[in-house]
C-alpha cells in the first residue's frame, strides 16, 4: 500500500496517510463521546468506542506512538470543546488508556489479532481510566468507604465496556489485512 518514496511527516515516524488515519480514529472517539453524552444510566459506556478506536488505530498503524497520538489528539480536542467536568484531568483520562495500549503493543506487536489479548488490554486500560477519577476524589477528601465503592463499580463497568469494545478489533484487523487495505508490518519492517 505504501510507496518506496513515501516520506514520514509527523514525529518523524508517521506518513501522511497514517497520520490522517490516526486523526480519524481520534475524531471518531470525540464524536462518539459527544453522541453518548445521553443519560443512558450505564456507567462506563463511553469506553466501548474509546477502546475500540484506540486498538483499531494501533492495529492499522502498528508503530510505536500511534495509540498515544490518538489519545493526545482526543484529549486535547475534548479539553478544547469543553467535554467533561474534569478540566485538565480529561488529558489523563484519554492518555492513560492510550499508554496501556502502547505498552501492550511494545510487549507484543501482534496483540491486536488476538481476542484474548485485545480483551485483556481493553479491560486493563479502561480500569486504569476509572482509577484516575478515584485519585482526584481522594485528593479532594471524599469519604473512603464511598470512594472505594464508587471506584469498584466504576472500574468494573469501565472494564466491562472497554473489554466488549476491544473484542471487535481482531476480526476487523484481519478483514482489513485480507482485503489489502492495511499491510502486515511491524515497527522494524515499517521503518524507512
Model-derived regions: residue spans:
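Juxtamembrane membrane-interface segments at transmembrane alpha-helix termini
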Residues: 56-62, 80-88, 103-110, 129-135
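Aromatic-anchored segments of alpha-helical transmembrane domains
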Residues: 26-35, 72-81, 122-132
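Short helix-perturbing small/polar motifs within transmembrane alpha-helices
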Residues: 3-6, 10, 20-25, 92-134, ...
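Juxtamembrane/transmembrane-helix boundary motifs in multi-pass membrane proteins
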Residues: 9, 13, 17, 42, ...
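Interfacial aromatic-anchored transmembrane helix boundaries in multi-pass membrane proteins
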Residues: 31-43, 74-103, 137
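Hydrophobic transmembrane alpha-helices
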Residues: 2-60, 65
Amino acid at each position: 500500500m505504501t510507496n518506496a518514496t513515501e516520506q514520514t511527516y509527523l514525529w518523524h515516524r508517521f506518513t501522511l496517510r497514517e497520520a490522517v488515519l490516526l486523526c480519524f480514529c481520534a475524531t471518531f472517539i470525540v464524536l462518539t463521546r459527544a453522541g453518548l453524552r445521553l443519560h443512558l444510566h450505564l456507567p462506563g459506556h463511553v469506553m466501548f468506542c474509546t477502546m475500540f478506536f484506540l486498538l483499531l488505530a494501533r492495529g492499522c498503524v502498528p508503530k510505536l506512538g500511534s495509540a498515544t497520538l490518538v489519545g493526545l489528539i482526543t484529549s486535547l480536542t475534548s479539553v478544547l470543546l469543553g467535554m467533561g467536568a474534569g478540566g485538565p484531568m480529561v488529558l489523563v483520562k484519554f492518555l492513560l488508556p492510550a499508554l496501556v495500549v502502547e505498552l501492550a503493543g511494545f510487549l507484543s506487536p501482534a496483540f491486536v489479532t488476538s481476542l484474548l489479548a485485545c480483551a485483556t488490554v481493553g479491560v486493563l486500560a479502561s480500569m486504569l481510566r476509572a482509577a484516575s477519577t478515584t485519585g482526584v476524589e481522594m485528593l479532594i477528601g471524599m469519604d473512603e468507604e464511598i470512594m472505594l465503592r464508587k471506584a469498584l463499580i466504576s472500574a468494573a463497568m469501565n472494564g466491562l465496556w472497554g473489554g466488549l469494545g476491544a473484542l471487535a478489533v481482531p476480526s476487523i484487523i484481519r478483514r482489513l489485512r485480507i482485503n489489502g487495505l492495511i499491510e502486515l508490518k511491524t515497527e522494524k519492517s515499517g521503518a524507512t
